[in-house]
Amino acid sequence: MATSHLLAAASSTAASSATFRPPLLSLRSPPPSSLRLNRRRHFQVVRAAETDKETKANAPEKAPAGGSSFNQLLGIKGAKQENDIWKIRLQLTKPVTWPPLVWGVLCGAAASGNFHWTVEDVAKSIVCMIMSGPCLTGYTQTINDWYDRDIDAINEPYRPIPSGAISENEVITQIWALLLAGLGLGALLDVWAGHDFPIIFYLAVGGSLLSYIYSAPPLKLKQNGWIGNFALGASYIGLPWWAGQALFGTLTPDIVVLTSLYSIAGLGIAIVNDFKSVEGDRALGLQSLPVAFGMETAKWICVGAIDITQLSVAGYLFSSGKPYYALALLGLTIPQVVFQFQYFLKDPVKYDVKYQASAQPFFVLGLLVTALATSH
């Protein structure tokens, strides 16, 4: 639930190119596809065009030479242009953004203290992971691309939607199919777990709504760097954790507070992905933190959110009488700081992939340490 997450309504970092759009009834209306300047105002606004022909006309027919089929399947930059509609559909869901949601479910199950390595519990967790990852994160990423066509037309104009590789009806069908599948699995898990109150279903609904308003006007949370990135962090960390814990145990207020705090670290991780989109964000008037504060200040906001959050959680664990877990989390935070100075703070655009590949394994292990600590 990612959103992202869960429920996606998740994340992403998630990956080096991933991200999360007015009420679902408005999905039939074409998304913004042209950028116009309002001469009576001093700022840029995005207005919906009557058709998507302008974007398609300006988009190159082919992706850059040397594109990778593997990147295409993962939904990241450097993808090879594909004609197979199912590969294109998969690309829109950005599978590279699913693992954080899957990991969040795992952490929630561990934090419940009631997960057992039985066939039934493993099956429940797998269904919850499918709901959170492929279904609801896939929904989140597809609807994000749908409403993000103008940015993609600037940053990656050869992506499936701005290039016209997939039709409007096909995109809308995919959005609805993934959303309904995710909500259906949420309802199934509530019945399977014997819940009197359908908490997982409502988490799925909440995550899906969060994903929607993240990218879609009139709210379009992503226009605000603080609110948008926190929503992204909550979707990729808090929501899947809550779903996993609710599936096997009880979702308590202290866990909600702790995971919400961890979502601040998710905010920092989300900022990492904003640096490479500065040109498109600035052109469309999106106030990402690198645009609003400048690259140098945004770098320190990013690492500060990640590091201070983990140190705060370690302090909480220590004060709760769990010093060994606190020391383990502290030990996992130190390598992240080292990689921040080695890669990210030097050049967040050039080294973003190296930094995330090096530092994020320690971050996600820290999540598991925290989950295990709260289960005892």
From Swiss-Prot:
Residues 48-69 are annotated as: Disordered. Pfam families: UbiA. Its main location: plastid. Residues 1-47 form a transit peptide. GO terms for cellular component: chloroplast membrane. Its EC number is 2.5.1.62. InterPro entries: Chl_synth, ChlG, Prenyltransferase_related, UbiA_prenyltransferase, UbiA_sf. GO terms for biological process: chlorophyll biosynthetic process. The chain crosses the membrane at residues 95-115, 171-191, 197-217, 230-250, 255-275, 300-320, 325-345, 355-375. Keywords: Chlorophyll biosynthesis, Chloroplast, Membrane, Plastid, Transferase, Transit peptide, Transmembrane, Transmembrane helix. Belongs to the UbiA prenyltransferase family. Chlorophyll synthase subfamily. Involved in one of the last steps of the biosynthesis of chlorophyll a. This is Chlorophyll synthase, chloroplastic.
